[in-house]
Amino acid sequence: QDSVELDIKPEIEFVRKYIGSGSETGQLSVKFRVVDPVGNEIINRILNEDITKNIHIDNPQLWWPRGYGEQNLYTVSVDLVKNDGTVVDNWTRKIGLRTITMDRTKDKWGERFATCVNGVNIFAMGADYIPEDHLLGRVTPETTRTLLEKAVFANFNSIRVWGGGYYPDDWFYDMCDEMGLVVWQDFMFACAVYDLTPEFEANITAEFIDNLKRIRHHASLGLMCGNNEMEQFVKERNWVSKDSEVRDYIIMYERILPQIMKQYAPQVFYWPASPSSGGSFDDPRDENRGDVHYWDVWH
């Protein structure tokens, strides 16, 4: 690939807190910089007219999962600058240039469900990441790195953040970027049903948006999944005590979440549940479509 295009759209909030009266907002500009994986600054621009820009990177060094290529990471920095040169705010992150989606091509058995990175279907090898410790204060970057290094030693190239735990800290995703571990990220719902009251909807919507904005830039983020094991058991009427819980399930995972994903992380593949064949209670345990949980191996 000769070039890639980055869509740049900074969001500026609480301007008056930093520069005084609203009449001074025109004195702000946005400085955008990109440093390549070996440390060369390849882009340095001031975006002071239209801060929504398309930026081209020539001869991109792509990010790949472990075992398929290098984990090339670019450093992107956005500064909010006053006209006297004072930096009001800064956002700096590492990103990878890649495409990730799921190949669901129909085949003679049913339908594929393969992680496709940069047009190449990978053989995903990994396990669930559950809370490292019952006392979350004992989870540190060092403990997480030790665990993920063991995953790499076991030749993993993927890892699933289980929906019965919690959203990991930023360092987890940074390390997965660095180590080439593709992340299957569940939203934090598992093995239950929920009453979708207006208050609960407002609460979970804020949680969805906050976490998507926090992790969506990561090269390793391969998929967002609505929940763990709920589509199957709601279909089988396990845990369900009233019809409204089935209705609310559909609203949460097949309306609210897809809409939020489309708005805040349209480049990330969304899967409604695990296991699932694609949603709508369409035989979520079909072994020839989507993903399957096979319990017989340990029950």
Residue ranges and their predicted role:
Residues S158-E178, V182-H299:
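Substrate-binding/catalytic cleft of secreted carbohydrate-active enzymes
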